Curated annotation (Swiss-Prot):
GO terms for biological process: amide biosynthetic process; glutamyl-tRNA aminoacylation. It comes from Thermoplasma volcanium (strain ATCC 51530 / DSM 4299 / JCM 9571 / NBRC 15438 / GSS1). This is Glutamate--tRNA ligase. Catalyzes the attachment of glutamate to tRNA(Glu) in a two-step reaction: glutamate is first activated by ATP to form Glu-AMP and then transferred to the acceptor end of tRNA(Glu). Its EC number is 6.1.1.17.
Amino acid sequence: MYEEEIKKIALLNAYQHNGKAELKSVIGKVMAEIADLRKNPKLVSELAKAAVDSVNSMSKDDIVNIVEKQFPEALKKDKKPEEHRLPDLQGVNGHVVMRLAPSPSGPLHIGHTRMAILNDEYVKRYGGDLILRIEDTNPTNIDPEAYAMIPEDLEWLGVNVTKTVIQSERFDLYYSVAKKLIENGHLYICTCDREEFKRKKLASIPCKDRDNPPETNLYLFEKMLDGEIKAGAAVAVMKTDLNHPNPSVRDWIAFRIIDAKHPRTGDKYRVFPMMSFSVAVDDHYLGLTHVLRGKDQLTNTEKQRYVFEYNGWNKPYYYHYGMIRFPGTRLKTSLMKKGIQAGQYDGWSDVRLGTVRAMARRGYQPETFRRYWINSGLREIDAVFSWEIFNSLNREFVDPKAYRFSFTKDPVEIKMEGSNGLTARLPYHPSHPEYGVRKYEIGDTVYISKGDADKIADGERFRLKDLCYVVRKGDRFLFDGTEMKEKTKIINWCPPNSREFQVLKPDGSIDKGLIEPASKGYRGISQLERYGYVNFYDSDEKAYFTHD
């Protein structure tokens, strides 16, 4: 049913890669384009392998002829890719005001990029403001460096923030709103034991302080602010519905006392608002029109409804998207921070982490994040993040600019008997002759990877890519000319003056080998031929693995 469509993908891939289809690239493209197959990766692998094997048995000329005759539309440079459009927002009246609301516990990670990009896309569509609101109302969970790292990450992603607000600078506003709610009987001060309060709430029983008059509650709130009440001895509680089906929504805590210095305000404040209170107040006073958030915030949305209704405020439009699971990716900020402090990681950009800056170091492009989340949209169903699709998208952005180099992992030296000297002229990019070539004068010695060497059978003829043919005779390697006699395996190689090189991978492993001299001084994304894409970030001696 899908064989012809997958073969077309394999043919186009081979056309783009000098006549050889790359299996992993084809699998990624199939997963990205054929939605019905995404739930059956085993079938995708089988069908893609069959298509790649078939295409790779064809000559380059045959592939070019087929693609140019049968799929000319795919070759048009001005052909636009399939456009995925986010659904329209309801209730838009001229422009929108939207927000990003991270906690400054660390830099942004890949999970944060969804809310950043979706909000940015809507503000671009309708015009208006995108507010960065740093929610730093928990002084015990703040990394002071995050105040700078978060805007840096957003700038790298291409997100256009028009205004920045820091919640720790708005405590007087929160206190003012709280006092008004106390005066109107919607907020009370509870001095019950914490566990007793929790038990009563679960049983829908009011605590002893619930019906205290506003005057008493105002007096106690002022004593909390003045430092006359100890931490844990009193909290300010939003009066809701004790019979609400969700116990979390019943009389929820709006303020608590924390005796800890805040990185920005020091000990100026000791009564800190809980997230649902400060968020609702800010959403009103900042003029939010639309809020995008995960389904995990549905309970908080319901809690915040009381703040809006008690104050007579209009609520923004809320959209709750499904949760995304990121398999095999370290995203929990507290654990990443502990690992950094323990020396397990070399900082927030360590490629073993899932932070935005680690992804940038590996070579992922800002456009990849944007395309992926636009394609995912605002769906309410939970999903698993697809690294195959993500990598396939990134490959589209990096491949045209990725210079090609040769890397031999665990190198083995081979001497070609009968070689009188060869000249290799290797293009930096098979589709961009304007990038130039690497030129090497080869005597009789090259290096290949141990993995390739171990697979060469006695008597087998193989091709050193873009150089010559060689026949193995026991432990000897015999030069066998440059003319193709039959289809043979192609092996990557490095010249004798190659240098030692390492590729650092996100699973913590390191591949060591040799890399060709022409890579010296190169910075940016490269494709190490028949190995994968890497990012030459800051060194000639190492690169960071991006993906296959």
